[in-house]
Amino acid sequence: MLIKEYRITLPFTKEEYRLGQKYMTARKTHESSNAGDNVQLLEKSSFTDKNGVKGTFTHKVFLLKKSLPRYASAILPKSALKIEEKSWNSYPNTKTIYSCPFFGEKFYLCIESIHKDGRDEEENVFGLSKDILKKRIVDHVDIARDEVEGKDVKTDEDPRMFKSKLTGRGPLTSPNWRKEVNPAMVVYKLVTVNFNYWGFQNRVENLVQTNGLREVFLKAHRSLFCWMDEWIDLSEEQIEQFEQSTYQLMMNNTIENKLNEDIKNMNISEKKGNQQNTYSKGDFKCPNVNCQHVCSECKHMLMTTTTTTTKTVTETTTTVQSPICYRNMVC
């Protein structure tokens, strides 16, 4: 098991970051979808944690086939190309757990985040035990001075060159900018990764932490800073509208994948006596037992609805399946 605590100083207030992070996450999701990556939203609901703080729970699935080299996606099983994300966001605290069905319990990745105003760092903001503190590695991520891989460098997303027209912040050219900027805040991210495969554990855990997550944190927060003028003046309502368009995009991905899977598994030809009826992608039989006709317009399918039964971060859920129309009509 490898435990790292990433600390990221940013020239924002905690409240500015809350809105900016929403915008950044939504835009990154749009960009990923346009690039061919597939993100599905399975659930979005409210929860209350053990301290009585309310937040939002999301359950997403990332399909990685289009993000991997062709040879890798060709030899890996389907279950290895799917990553599940469960996230509890009760800002300024968040917790996200990632899993992969292919590896089961042998793979565990957890990211806990705390956001604090001010540039002074706290040495044990997560309240870790002495044993965990001995294992923890602290890594400072500098959005201006840390190098990004050459192929991923974008001149319009370089904090050393960007100056905000709306706030006057930037460019971040001073070697000591983290001690000089005002306002300032620190993002703390405690990342725990465990890959329980003998002979591969250390290599994979280091790969996930360094080449994976650290690069993601660095690039995402560079973008957040350089996109400042796009979101800094947006209202809460405008941010929420942008988020809703993202959720709709993910729901469309979920529906499209479910539709394609249903069609793939369906016997698209039926024989009734001497007559053979053949159904195309947009013309197949409704799975609802009460619906006897072939449905070519509404494309009925089985969708999954989830009901929350507890009010903690470790909540359990019950899942009920019901036939729901592709065009949002109950069958």
UniProtKB/Swiss-Prot annotation:
It comes from the Eukaryota. Keywords: Lipid-binding, Transport. It holds the Pfam family IP_trans. CDD domains: SRPBCC_PITP (cd07815). InterPro entries: PI_transfer, PI_transfer_N, START-like_dom_sf. GO terms for cellular component: cytoplasm. One of its GO terms (molecular function) is phosphatidylcholine transporter activity. Catalyzes the transfer of PtdIns and phosphatidylcholine between membranes. Belongs to the PtdIns transfer protein family. PI transfer class IIA subfamily. This is Phosphatidylinositol transfer protein 4. It comes from Dictyostelium discoideum (Social amoeba). The lineage of its organism: Eukaryota, Amoebozoa, Evosea, Eumycetozoa, Dictyostelia. The gene is pitD.
